[in-house]
């Protein structure tokens, strides 16, 4: 497999369940393209010039969560993100495997990955 470069992109499929889709334009499924190398501080806005190589890391789920917050989330950020990661009560699956078995936010994304977010909390 080729080494990622700053211009390589990853195509990621994102799915929502348990009501989380309501925060994301009421769409259960999204497809996003993200850079394969991203800023170590998880900044998602384009900067000119791009960060130096020593300030980059492979795109991981933590970056994906920041990207979703900044570009897909339509309302009530506090229902999805807390302290830079997903809130407690949100189950995250990476290619049908619990993200806790994959390293949680440190999981390095690969082209074609599917990431599913399911809220296990329901109001009443």
From Swiss-Prot:
InterPro entries linked: Beta-grasp_dom_sf, Mopterin_synth/thiamin_S_b, Urm1
GO biological-process terms attached to the record: protein urmylation; tRNA thio-modification; tRNA wobble uridine modification
Keywords (A to Z) from UniProt: Cytoplasm, Isopeptide bond, tRNA processing, Ubl conjugation pathway
Pathway: tRNA modification; 5-methoxycarbonylmethyl-2-thiouridine-tRNA biosynthesis
Cross-link Glycyl lysine isopeptide (Gly-Lys) (interchain with K-? in acceptor proteins) placement: 124
GO cellular component: cytosol
Modified residues (1-thioglycine): 124
Broad class of the protein's primary localization: cytoplasm
Localization (cell): Cytoplasm
Domain of life assignment: Eukaryota
Region described as Disordered: 34-53
Modifications after synthesis and translation: C-terminal thiocarboxylation occurs in 2 steps, it is first acyl-adenylated (-COAMP) via the hesA/moeB/thiF part of UBA4, then thiocarboxylated (-COSH) via the rhodanese domain of UBA4.
CDD domains: Ubl_Urm1
Family: Belongs to the URM1 family.
Function: Acts as a sulfur carrier required for 2-thiolation of mcm(5)S(2)U at tRNA wobble positions of cytosolic tRNA(Lys), tRNA(Glu) and tRNA(Gln). Serves as sulfur donor in tRNA 2-thiolation reaction by being thiocarboxylated (-COSH) at its C-terminus by the MOCS3 homolog UBA4. The sulfur is then transferred to tRNA to form 2-thiolation of mcm(5)S(2)U. Prior mcm(5) tRNA modification by the elongator complex is required for 2-thiolation. Also acts as a ubiquitin-like protein (UBL) that is covalently conjugated via an isopeptide bond to lysine residues of target proteins such as AHP1.
Protein name: Ubiquitin-related modifier 1
Originating species: Coprinopsis cinerea (strain Okayama-7 / 130 / ATCC MYA-4618 / FGSC 9003) (Inky cap fungus)
